[in-house]
Amino acid sequence: MAAINRDDVAHLARLAHIEMSAEELDRMAGELAVIVESVKSVSEAAGDDVPATSHPIPLTNVFREDVVGHTFTAEQSLSGAPDAYEGRFKVPAILDED
């Protein structure tokens, strides 16, 4: 990876329509150079014998089997509701109708 310099940061800032002072350009160039070096060192550490992974640990399904148990009918569910309309719970509106 090529080193990031002040001119690169200025070019990127222009592309992103971000105004940066000379001090900000210098500081950002230094910070980005550190990041690039960090990525470079990680790239070197992972050799061809290390398989690419998206997770550091294997993923397994930890969900239980979906077993249908005792369920209430719609009427039973709505029996304790303070208000219902056409077989559904009726609740106060919280959003405008705009």
Swiss-Prot record:
The protein's GO terms of the molecular function aspect are:
asparaginyl-tRNA synthase (glutamine-hydrolyzing) activity; ATP binding; glutaminyl-tRNA synthase (glutamine-hydrolyzing) activity
Q: Which EC class does it fall in?
A: ligase
Q: Which family does it belong to?
A: Belongs to the GatC family.
* Protein name per its UniProtKB record: Aspartyl/glutamyl-tRNA(Asn/Gln) amidotransferase subunit C
Keyword set, alphabetical order: ATP-binding, Ligase, Nucleotide-binding, Protein biosynthesis
What does the record note on quaternary structure? Heterotrimer of A, B and C subunits.
Q: Which GO terms describe its biological process?
A: regulation of translational fidelity; translation
Function, as annotated:
Allows the formation of correctly charged Asn-tRNA(Asn) or Gln-tRNA(Gln) through the transamidation of misacylated Asp-tRNA(Asn) or Glu-tRNA(Gln) in organisms which lack either or both of asparaginyl-tRNA or glutaminyl-tRNA synthetases. The reaction takes place in the presence of glutamine and ATP through an activated phospho-Asp-tRNA(Asn) or phospho-Glu-tRNA(Gln).
Biological source species: Arthrobacter sp. (strain FB24)
Report which gene this protein is encoded by.
gatC
The UniProt catalytic activity note for this protein reads: L-glutamyl-tRNA(Gln) + L-glutamine + ATP + H2O = L-glutaminyl-tRNA(Gln) + L-glutamate + ADP + phosphate + H(+); L-aspartyl-tRNA(Asn) + L-glutamine + ATP + H2O = L-asparaginyl-tRNA(Asn) + L-glutamate + ADP + phosphate + 2 H(+)
Write down the EC number. Answer: 6.3.5.-
This protein's superkingdom? Answer: Bacteria
Q: Name one Pfam family in it.
A: GatC
The question of whether Manganese is a record keyword is answered with no
Q: Does Protein biosynthesis appear among the keywords?
A: yes
